[in-house]
């Protein structure tokens, strides 16, 4: 809006110009004005018209600001649309990332559960192998003179080593797959953070609810337009004042010649008065001047003199108005630059998003590879677990069989001891019968020996038939009769075997 002084000057000049063409009969008579004063006012009015360049510049500023505003509105709309799209894509990427993370978490839980199962199986296998290592074979079951050996000596321990090595390799593969996939997830996270960072780095866009600047650009453009209109009106008033000065000078005797001479002395100017001062006597102004009454001329001179006092103020208003418009134009350009910067930063975020989306396929492929590798290695580990379970069952059966062997040996030895005891009792009974038989024979011999001839006594003096019980080895490679009893097991061997059997 124009300043109050500018408005007053413009209004005063317009009112004076209107009064100059009025022929009101109530106007007071005014004294004549020296021609020199009129010429000075004419030259001052001519110089004031140089403000036309300022008005044109103001118009250019307004036109440019309006164009910049229109471009900024379009660019801001595009930027807002692009930002909304990027934000939606980021949301989609985060959903995909959460899905990939769930796959990783499931694989991680499966891996931890698998490790627990492996630990349990390994602990059971180790416990069983320790039993075999700690169980020394009793010498009764081995050749004489052989050094003591544990049960583990008689089985292939390499199976366990190979199984353990295979399990370690599978676990290492699972760990490598997990590490590789974790690296892919980390890179995906970095990509998403990079897009967010680029988007957040973009300056905010002005909006009615969130004004980045103190004055919206549209308000600045409206103010520039109002200023431009006010300056144009001031220039129009200066132009009418100039025309009125020309008329007053031409209406004064000798005024035209003096004006031309003074204009020449005033130096070169973009505005020439020669064309409007000379006239050719045929135009309407010349006719008006010729028919102008003294009263009308005096009224015209009064208006010229009154307006002349306000020319300087109007020119200053035009200059100050242009300065204010230049400042406003700078603010418009500043906001436009802000919008352009926001758009460029948003484009950077969009380009970064395109790069991330180009790599999205590799992240999804990494998930598939991770799942496949885990399945392969888990199948291999479950197979090894089955083998480990078979080894545990075999080793436990082996240890149990040895304990059964010890108990069986002890049972057989006990049976032999019982048989031996029975045979001892039988031998004692036989010996007693033999003693009784010997006594009976002596008694009979004494009773009938003197009466029976020797021919009838044939064989009666033979000793009673003897019986002998011996142990016989009927096994493979046996040598027939053996003496003595079975070898006893080492002290504590049987008790230890019984404890292990009862503990299973």
From Swiss-Prot:
Subcellular location: Cytoplasm; Preautophagosomal structure membrane
Alphabetic keyword roster: Autophagy, Cytoplasm, Membrane
GO molecular function list: molecular adaptor activity; protein kinase activator activity
Coiled-coil regions, chain positions: none
One Pfam family linked to the record: ATG17_like
Any one GO biological process: piecemeal microautophagy of the nucleus
InterPro entries for this protein: Atg17, ATG17-like_dom
GO cellular component: Atg1/ULK1 kinase complex; phagophore assembly site membrane
Topology in membrane: Peripheral membrane protein
General function of this protein: Autophagy-specific protein that functions in response to autophagy-inducing signals as a scaffold to recruit other ATG proteins to organize pre-autophagosomal structure (PAS) formation. Modulates the timing and magnitude of the autophagy response, such as the size of the sequestering vesicles. Plays particularly a role in pexophagy and nucleophagy.
Family: Belongs to the ATG17 family.
Protein name: Autophagy-related protein 17
Organism encoding this protein: Pyricularia oryzae (strain 70-15 / ATCC MYA-4617 / FGSC 8958)
